[in-house]
């Protein structure tokens, strides 16, 4: 059953997608290309070879590609903690933040489940991956309420162990 995996940029977040794909789940993940084009070239190769073969560039063409892969049976991995240029204003740590609606749109269109996933460093090179129970939203929930619930879930993950969260951009800009 295809699902939407959601998380934030926790510790070595790339390991989450790698684990999902290595466990036999066909996965597609959205990524934002690195600003350094030279490094981005190598990072894309590494991601496709070792982490997740279906790496989709962020943007409207990427969203269409993601939709196509989902319709063909792929699950999707999304980092929902990034500041986006399109989305809705939704509460995040008591302030309105522009937030992606992609997970909520997929829930509404396909009645799919959301699976929260969290990774934390235990020590040195040891990590603990927590795959939460799937969330099944009711049909009468709106894009806004689903998005708010996912932001609340992300807050809980962050507050669990704040030093594990890689917060490199301002969500409230």
Question: What spans do the regions from the language model cover?
Answer:
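Catalytic core of membrane glycerolipid acyltransferases/transacylases, capturing the structured
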Residues: 2-59, 85-90, 95-96, 121
